[in-house]
């Protein structure tokens, strides 16, 4: 991208944004009507017109049913898509809406509907219009939550979701360049007041960005931080993969490691770096638990408890560690974790008994 964040995106730069998608059979463009997504649609249409052969483009607008203006905005997107020669669909999020956690629920519904639209269109990718500004906001949100390296890596350019690749071709592009591009082309766009609603976290953080920028913490810097942490995260993931292989080799294939259970030799596990041990636990709990992803903070507490239990077992001598009775046993995110017989065991936690079961036959 150009160093001038207020200059329109050139034809050449736009080609680079979409170049890796040329061989896709079809693409779904997620377009709400705001400036970022309208720019995505306009740039993608211009790129596609320059190809002799390329993917079929389908524009999809999700109406969450949360604002009366949304239906009108969807119709305007349809008009713009038609002018660009693109197919358009409007999908609606139906049913009751939650009273808390509305942004997250709306996001999940949107991605679910987009994945359905992609499968119907034979598309391999769904393209969203996340920008460098969005990346900076995401980094701030996760920093305030106390996220680890993986969380602070924020959004990736490509992510697999529900069997569809979620692509973010504008992730390195500032919002100001997209607006400049639309103004140069005299293309209109909608203004969603939700983006300024201080009842939600992201708009509040967005309002702080100018003050952070004045201190050197602008969107470019925060996005660069995210990219560097993503690089570090990828390296730690490779180390964790190697650690899993190391632990399996130590067991010579005798210990369970699969869909039903995981088991690690405690002394070998203890020799690994703390971050790698955390990720091994997270992977096993997420794979075998039935209550969703485990929280990093809770797994950190679990690891501390395991370390203390292993140290206590070592101090008590080999007899205490070999008697087979659990030294530690707890559930987390639907998984059962125990330390017994010198091994860490992780498997699905027993399902809670229903009231009918408690009453007996």
Q: Where in the sequence are the language-model features?
A:
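AMP-forming adenylation/ATP pyrophosphatase catalytic core
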Residues: 2, 6-36, 54-58, 64, ...
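Core alpha/beta nucleotide-donor-binding catalytic domains of modification enzymes
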Residues: 2-208
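Non-catalytic, surface-exposed connector residues within folded enzymatic/regulatory domains
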Residues: 71, 100, 199, 216-219, ...
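Non-catalytic alpha-helical coupling and interface elements of nucleotide-dependent molecular machines
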Residues: 119, 145, 187, 210-217, ...
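Residues that cap or delimit alpha-helices
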Residues: 174, 212, 273-274
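Mid-to-C-terminal catalytic subdomains of enzymes
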Residues: 181, 185-227, 314, 327-332, ...
